Swiss-Prot record:
The lineage of its organism: Archaea, Methanobacteriati, Methanobacteriota, Stenosarchaea group, Halobacteria. Keywords: Ribonucleoprotein, Ribosomal protein, RNA-binding, rRNA-binding. One of two assembly initiator proteins, it binds directly to the 5'-end of the 23S rRNA, where it nucleates assembly of the 50S subunit. Stabilizes the tertiary rRNA structure within the 23S rRNA domain (domain I) to which it binds. Located at the polypeptide exit tunnel on the outside of the subunit. One of its GO terms (molecular function) is rRNA binding. Residues 10-24 have a biased composition (Basic residues). GO terms for cellular component: large ribosomal subunit. CDD domains: KOW_RPL26 (cd06089). This is Large ribosomal subunit protein uL24. Belongs to the universal ribosomal protein uL24 family. PROSITE patterns: RIBOSOMAL_L24 (PS01108). Pfam families: KOW, Ribosomal_L26. Residues 1-26 are annotated as: Disordered. GO terms for biological process: translation. Part of the 50S ribosomal subunit. Interacts weakly with protein L4.
Length: 120
């Protein structure tokens, strides 16, 4: 691993998809932090998040899409209006959101969260 910032950024941009999962993590709300014993979690579609920064700060909504290529998420009701009137989802960086509710339909995800709770 290089110390040079340019090479650091380059490796982040060119990371394969299985490594980009690490780039779409967001902090957990205080009650979820206490429940699961960890500070942040990978954001999945179906999770509920609160926007902390930007024009949409204070908005809360469900994650409708996670784009690993661009390392951004799309949240329902956080949209921009194009000049032709069409509403498009506003991409958000996961560092600007807080997870307030987890989608635990995936049993493996739930088991992983519980096991990390035991080790913490």
């Amino acid at each position: 691993m290089s110390k040079q910032p340019d090479k650091q950024r380059k490796s982040q941009r060119r990371a394969p998809l299985h490594e980009r999962h690490k780039q779409v993590r967001a902090t957990l709300s205080a009650d979820l932090r206490e429940e699961y014993g960890q500070r942040n979690v990978r954001v999945n579609a179906g999770d509920t998040v609160e926007v902390l920064r930007g024009d949409f700060a204070g908005e809360e909504g469900e994650v409708i899409n996670v784009d690993l290529d661009k390392a951004v998420i799309h949240v329902e009701d956080v949209t921009l209006e194009k000049t032709d009137g069409e509403e498009v989802p506003r991409p958000l960086d996961t560092s600007n959101v807080r997870v307030t509710d987890l989608d635990l339909e995936d049993e493996k995800r739930e088991a992983r969260l519980e096991s990390e709770d035991d080790s913490a």
